Swiss-Prot record:
Keyword annotations: Metal-binding, Ribonucleoprotein, Ribosomal protein, RNA-binding, rRNA-binding, Zinc
NCBIfam families (UniProt xref): L31 (TIGR00105), PRK00019.1 (NF000612)
Note on how the cofactor is bound: Binds 1 zinc ion per subunit.
Any one GO CC term of the record: ribonucleoprotein complex
Protein name: Large ribosomal subunit protein bL31
InterPro entries associated with the record: Ribosomal_bL28/bL31-like_sf, Ribosomal_bL31, Ribosomal_bL31_A, Ribosomal_bL31_sf
Species per Swiss-Prot/TrEMBL record: Thermosipho africanus (strain TCF52B)
Molecular functions (GO terms): metal ion binding; rRNA binding; structural constituent of ribosome
Cofactor(s) required, per the database record: Zn(2+)
GO biological process: translation
Function: Binds the 23S rRNA.
Family classification: Belongs to the bacterial ribosomal protein bL31 family. Type A subfamily.
Binding site for Zn(2+): C16, C18, C36, C39
Tree of life domain: Bacteria
Length: 69
């Protein structure tokens, strides 16, 4: 690698709206984010069960269309 052309990496604190703080190495300054792994529903346990949402009967419509009952 060439010397003097790469940005300096430093330890920064990423602060989430939920109050959690995570430390990473980055060339940027401190960062604020809206969601993180501490507050996102997928990582809180609602993700696997809550990912399939059938609000308009799409699954039933598919089963009926292809006779999968």
């Amino acid at each position: 690698m060439k010397k003097g052309i790469h940005p300096e990496m430093k330890l920064i604190t990423v602060k989430c709206a939920c109050g959690a703080e995570h430390k990473f190495y980055s060339a940027k300054e401190n960062v604020r984010i809206d969601v993180c792994s501490s507050c996102h529903p997928f990582y809180k346990g609602a993700g696997a069960a809550g990912m399939i949402v059938d609000t308009e009967g799409r699954i039933e419509k598919f089963k009926k269309k292809y006779n999968l009952d």
